[in-house]
C-alpha cells in the first residue's frame, strides 16, 4: 500500500512536525500574555516574563473584572456579536437560497450576482457610508454596528456554492411535486443539509463581529455603548486608564502591561471557547462551499 512506503512516511512525519510548529507559533503568544497578566508589575515591565508568571498575582484580573466599565463593554460585545451573527445568517441564507436557483427560475439572477461582486470589490467608502448611517438615524445605536455589514458577499458566495452543489436537486423537485413552498423547502431541506456551511459562515461572522472595533469608534458617540473591542482599543492604543474607573493609587500599583494582557486574553477567550464546538463542521463547510462539480 502507498501509505506504507518510505516516501509517504517521510511526508507524514514532515506534516506532523510542521503542524506542531505551526500550533506552537499560534499558542505561544496566548500563553505569554496569560503569564504576563498573572505577573507582578515590575518583572512584566522589565520584560522578564516569558511563558510562566513571575511573582504570581491576580491584581490585574481583579481590576479588570472589578470595574463596571469593562463588564459593560464585555456585555455590549457579546450582544453585538450574537445579534450581528443572527441577522447576518438570516439575510445571507435567504439571499443564497434565491441566488442558487437557475436563471429560468430567477429572472435577473446574473445581474444581482454582478452587483454583489462589484460592491464586494468596490465599496461606497467611509464618508458616504457614515452619511447614510446618519441619515437613517442609526448613529449611537447598536444597529449602526450590525446592519451595514449584515450581508458579507464572501460568506454569501460560500453558502451559495454549497446550496448549488451540496443539496440534491431531486429532493427539491420531489418537495415541489408534493406541494411544498419555497420556505418549507428552505427550512426542511436546505438548512438541515447545510449545517456545515452555516457553521462555517457563522464562525466567520462571529469572529468579524467580535473583533471589529473601528465601526464602534466611528458610529458610537457614547463610550458606555462601546463593545469590548472598541473599549480595549481606546485603553490600549491611547493608554487611557480613565475608563477603568480606578483611583490614582490603584493605577500606580498596576502595570499597564499586565492589565492590557489580561484584557487581550479575555478578548480572545470567547472565540477560543466557541471554535471547538464548530470545528467538526468547519473544514467540511469550507471544502463543500468552495468547489463546484
Residues of each region from the PLM?
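A hydrophobic, multi-pass inner-membrane permease signature
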Residues: 1-293
Amino acid at each position: 500500500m502507498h501509505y506504507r512506503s518510505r516516501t509517504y512516511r517521510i511526508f507524514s512525519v514532515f506534516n506532523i512536525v510542521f503542524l506542531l510548529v505551526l500550533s506552537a507559533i499560534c499558542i505561544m503568544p496566548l500563553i505569554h500574555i496569560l503569564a504576563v497578566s498573572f505577573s507582578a508589575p515590575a518583572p512584566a515591565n522589565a520584560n522578564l516574563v516569558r511563558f510562566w508568571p513571575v511573582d504570581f498575582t491576580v491584581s490585574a484580573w481583579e481590576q479588570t473584572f472589578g470595574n463596571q466599565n469593562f463588564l459593560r463593554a464585555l456585555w455590549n460585545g457579546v450582544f453585538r456579536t450574537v445579534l450581528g451573527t443572527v441577522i447576518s445568517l438570516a439575510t445571507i441564507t435567504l439571499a443564497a437560497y434565491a441566488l442558487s436557483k437557475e436563471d429560468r427560475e430567477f429572472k435577473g439572477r446574473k445581474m444581482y450576482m454582478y452587483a454583489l461582486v462589484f460592491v464586494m470589490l468596490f465599496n461606497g467608502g467611509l464618508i458616504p457610508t457614515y452619511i447614510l448611517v446618519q441619515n437613517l438615524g442609526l448613529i449611537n445605536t447598536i444597529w449602526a454596528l450590525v446592519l451595514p455589514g449584515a450581508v458579507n458577499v464572501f460568506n454569501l458566495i460560500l453558502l451559495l456554492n454549497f446550496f448549488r452543489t451540496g443539496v440534491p436537486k431531486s429532493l427539491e423537485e420531489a418537495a415541489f411535486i408534493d406541494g411544498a413552498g419555497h420556505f418549507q423547502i428552505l427550512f426542511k431541506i436546505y438548512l438541515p443539509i447545510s449545517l456545515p456551511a452555516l457553521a462555517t459562515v457563522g464562525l466567520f461572522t462571529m469572529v468579524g463581529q467580535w473583533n471589529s472595533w473601528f465601526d464602534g469608534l466611528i458610529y458610537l458617540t457614547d463610550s458606555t455603548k462601546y463593545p469590548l473591542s472598541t473599549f480595549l482599543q481606546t485603553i490600549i492604543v491611547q493608554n487611557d486608564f480613565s475608563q477603568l474607573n480606578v483611583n490614582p493609587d490603584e493605577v500606580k500599583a498596576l502595570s499597564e502591561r499586565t492589565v492590557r494582557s489580561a484584557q487581550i486574553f479575555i478578548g480572545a477567550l470567547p472565540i477560543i471557547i466557541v471554535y471547538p464546538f464548530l470545528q467538526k463542521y468547519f473544514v467540511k463547510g469550507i471544502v463543500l462551499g468552495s468547489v463546484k462539480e
